[in-house]
């Protein structure tokens, strides 16, 4: 039995999809425990590139059952559009299963998300506008719509009417928008009932019974540690807990059953949207990382902000997630750049901080303190073992390992599934 949690260690887009794709072929279940269609990832299989948004990367594995856990918020229109796209390409997306307790994104959530961001102007968070935040807000306010609700029309209608009593007041009186007709929302959800019905299960029961039977489970977290609503750069965060603890909550698997916590981390750092980013680059090197690394958001098409590796963030992520291992991605992007700066600490108003500053204000004012290491010029995209890497690349990896306080067990040297060096297999932990 193995229960492995995959967590982004930075601000997202670290390559979690690749890690899931590699490990997904060795497990029985791949679970997405949080998020929605607001965080895309790219997976390359057999030379084919797949851009996934709501579905877990495990849907591309022939052996694993992909599951959307209770912590996910689901846009049904986006879900079936993504599934149909995969089916058209020969993927058996019909194996997907969905927790009956997952919450649903309604069209009014998306409307509210967009008008609220527009209203905030320069103070906007930089959301994707897909209704994720408002859906989670309804969840914690106990007025959300769950998957199970669509199978009882009277409950569905009651919940929608109750929710719109408040939301229409907000839309009409505050944002000068038209009121939403409750019956239209009811019919919207009822239109998906028959296709949805065979996919819905008691996910926590299925997963725990699987673990009892010795099966392997992989939990594929969305977003990343620094976007966690509790542990991230609040308020520039997502609305869920994309950390190891959140994976337990969003799947129904208890923390004592977790065998490995695998952090996915780039050899440099990126971020999409607003918020503090101490190592962000505004010079030719930022442009180099963006261009060479292909740093464009899968969901939004926005260019990602780029910066050097931040070991303060890495140590923080290792601590709050209890990482047992790290998966270092995109090492090949740094080939041939001469010198590689590594942020080892911050300067905040003349005071050195080796760990994450306590306050939001201090983090906003943090200036990176760098050390540099020599880069390598050799092509590493064909390296199969750690010893195949040039000495300078090995030294860089070992230094990141030392600074992060966690062993690096996987190293990505290219986008392909086979372009991964395995130093330690977490399936054998």
Swiss-Prot record:
Its EC number is 6.3.4.4. Its cofactor is Mg(2+). One of its GO terms (cellular component) is cytoplasm. The keyword Magnesium applies. The keyword Phosphoprotein does not apply. Mg(2+) binds at residues 13, 40. Pathway: Purine metabolism; AMP biosynthesis via de novo pathway; AMP from IMP: step 1/2. InterPro entries: Adenylosuccin_syn_GTP-bd, Adenylosuccin_syn_Lys_AS, Adenylosuccinate_synth_dom1, Adenylosuccinate_synth_dom2, Adenylosuccinate_synth_dom3, Adenylosuccinate_synthetase, P-loop_NTPase. Substrate binds at residues 298-304. It is an enzyme of class 6 (ligase). Pfam families: Adenylsucc_synt (PF00709). The active site is at 13 (proton acceptor), 41 (proton donor). One of its GO terms (biological process) is 'de novo' AMP biosynthetic process. IMP binds at residues 13-16, 38-41, 128, 142, 223, 238, 302. Keywords: Cytoplasm, GTP-binding, Ligase, Magnesium, Metal-binding, Nucleotide-binding, Purine biosynthesis. GTP binds at residues 12-18, 40-42, 304, 330-332, 412-414. One of its GO terms (molecular function) is magnesium ion binding. It comes from the Bacteria. Gene3D superfamilies: Adenylosuccinate Synthetase, subunit A, domain 1, Adenylosuccinate Synthetase, subunit A, domain 2, Adenylosuccinate Synthetase, subunit A, domain 3. It is found in: Cytoplasm. CDD domains: AdSS (cd03108). Homodimer. NCBIfam families: PRK01117.1 (NF002223), purA (TIGR00184). Belongs to the adenylosuccinate synthetase family. This is Adenylosuccinate synthetase. It comes from Corynebacterium diphtheriae (strain ATCC 700971 / NCTC 13129 / Biotype gravis). The lineage of its organism: Bacteria, Bacillati, Actinomycetota, Actinomycetes, Mycobacteriales.
């Amino acid at each position: 039995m193995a229960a492995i949690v995959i967590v982004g260690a930075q601000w997202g887009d670290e390559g979690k999809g690749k890690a899931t794709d590699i490990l997904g072929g060795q497990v029985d279940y791949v679970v997405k425990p949080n998020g929605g269609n607001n965080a895309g990832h790219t997976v390359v299989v057999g030379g084919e590139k797949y851009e996934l948004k709501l579905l877990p990367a495990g849907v591309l594995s022939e052996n694993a059952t992909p599951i959307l856990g209770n912590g996910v918020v689901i846009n049904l229109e986006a879900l079936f559009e993504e599934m149909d796209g995969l089916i058209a390409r020969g993927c058996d997306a019909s194996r997907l299963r969905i927790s009956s307790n997952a919450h649903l994104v309604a069209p009014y959530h998306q409307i509210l998300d967009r008008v609220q961001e527009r209203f905030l102007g320069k103070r906007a968070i930089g959301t994707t506008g897909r209704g994720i935040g408002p859906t989670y807000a309804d969840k914690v306010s106990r007025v959300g719509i769950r998957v199970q609700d669509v199978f009882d029309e009277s409950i569905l209608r009651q919940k929608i009417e109750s929710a719109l009593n408040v939301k229409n007041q907000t839309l009409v009186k505050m944002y000068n928008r038209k009121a939403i007709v409750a019956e239209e929302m009811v019919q919207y959800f009822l239109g998906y009932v028959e296709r949805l019905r065979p996919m819905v299960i008691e996910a926590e029961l299925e997963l725990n019974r699987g673990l009892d039977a010795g099966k392997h489970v992989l939990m594929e977290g969305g977003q990343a540690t620094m976007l966690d609503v509790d542990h991230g750069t609040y308020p520039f965060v997502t609305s869920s807990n994309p950390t190891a603890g959140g994976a337990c909550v969003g799947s129904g698997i208890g923390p004592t059953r977790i065998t490995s916590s695998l952090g996915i981390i780039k050899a440099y750092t990126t971020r999409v949207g607003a918020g503090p980013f101490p190592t962000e680059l505004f010079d030719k090197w930022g442009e180099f990382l963006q261009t060479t690394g292909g740093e464009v958001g899968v969901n939004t098409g926005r260019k990602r902000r780029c910066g050097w590796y931040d070991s303060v963030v890495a140590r923080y992520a290792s601590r709050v997630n209890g990482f047992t291992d790290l998966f270092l991605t995109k090492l090949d992007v740094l080939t041939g750049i001469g010198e590689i700066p590594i942020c080892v600490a911050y300067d905040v108003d003349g005071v050195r901080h080796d760990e994450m500053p306590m306050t939001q204000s201090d983090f906003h004012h943090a200036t990176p303190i760098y050390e540099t290491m020599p880069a390598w010029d050799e092509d590493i995209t064909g390296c199969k073992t750690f010893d195949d890497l040039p000495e300078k690349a090995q030294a860089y990896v070992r230094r990141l390992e030392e600074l992060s306080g966690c062993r690096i067990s996987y190293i990505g040297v290219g986008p392909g599934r086979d372009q991964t060096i395995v130093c330690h297999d977490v399936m054998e932990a």
